Amino acid sequence: MSNASKKVIVGMSGGVDSSVSAYLLMQQGYQVEGLFMKNWEEDDTDEYCAASDDLADAEKVCETLGIELHTINFAAEYWDNVFEYFLEEYKAGRTPNPDIMCNKEIKFKAFLEFAAEALDADYIATGHYVRRQQRDGKWEMLRGLDSNKDQSYFLYTLSHEHIAQTLFPVGELEKPEVRRIAEEQGLVTADKKDSTGICFIGERKFKDFLQQYLPAKPGPIESVEGEALGEHEGLMYHTLGQRKGLHIGGMADNSGEPWYVVDKDVERNVLIVAQGKKHPRLYSQGLIAGQLHWVSRNAPPEAFDCTVKTRYRQQDIPCRVTPLSNGDFQVQFKEPVAAVTPGQSAVFYSDDVCLGGGIIEQRITDFEVKL
């Protein structure tokens, strides 16, 4: 079956990466159509929401390329499967990553199903910076060629079956090349800046947004020794390793070193801080990860060595991963790691291959093997 007989639906975000993805697939001979997903019901007067601008840009790009653009509203699915999870995690004192859940529930579930069933697609495509390869009859996900833009961290929940049905055209390119292609082809998104912030919040102030949905619960800030240092406006506004926005100055040991968030006592509603970025309470020897997703869909039966990222854009950390009897996995770092944050994801790699990952359930400060 040649590419000309295969239909690809490209998730058009109104950004340069998806725009160039559509163009590249056309060059490869596929039948290409676009789909714009509306995932958030915003107030039309909201100065921060760019959904209407993004749709307009997607329409212009598709017009330039001469392809059809479909639109679909996944706001209900987004609220039920992504946003409510996001709120529950913050209520529990954790720091979630909704972009990972959005990829899992919307882009590679709702979108994939809609494209296959309603639009008769052979593949979907996105502008993510990842690559794929087939080995032993199964598809694997590799980091994007542009290490600065690699997005495999956000896609670890994908299975080999998802990857088999998805094309990632810009994963083989570096970002400057993507912009150059967009400019050459006269695409309106060529100079559009990359989106930042959480997918549904956009550029607005996180604190203001969260206050609309979760009541703030002020409480004390304490040092690791239990000394009262001030008051926080709500545990949900703080994350481990945070330095700015504590408003407590360089007191206590008079060293003048900044304070860092090292823990949250959710039961007492206390934010715990320590002074200096080398403070041992800021560091973890390992972690316990739950809700595991393996790209192969086969959980490793025994301990193995690999590397892990505990946040996006982090250097790979050599580690030992051990399955536990309850289905969780214990991760032991070769060296201590700062600001390991419950609610975030631990993503595992073997060289360039993304093996999978899970949610950080707890940090391990003194290492004890828990089998």
Swiss-Prot record:
EC number(s) on file: 2.8.1.13
Site, as annotated: Interaction with tRNA: H128, Q344
Catalytic machinery residues: C102, C199
Keywords: ATP-binding, Cytoplasm, Disulfide bond, Nucleotide-binding, RNA-binding, Transferase, tRNA processing, tRNA-binding
Biological process, per Gene Ontology: tRNA wobble position uridine thiolation
Job description of the protein: Catalyzes the 2-thiolation of uridine at the wobble position (U34) of tRNA, leading to the formation of s(2)U34.
Protein name: tRNA-specific 2-thiouridylase MnmA
Organism for this UniProt entry: Idiomarina loihiensis (strain ATCC BAA-735 / DSM 15497 / L2-TR)
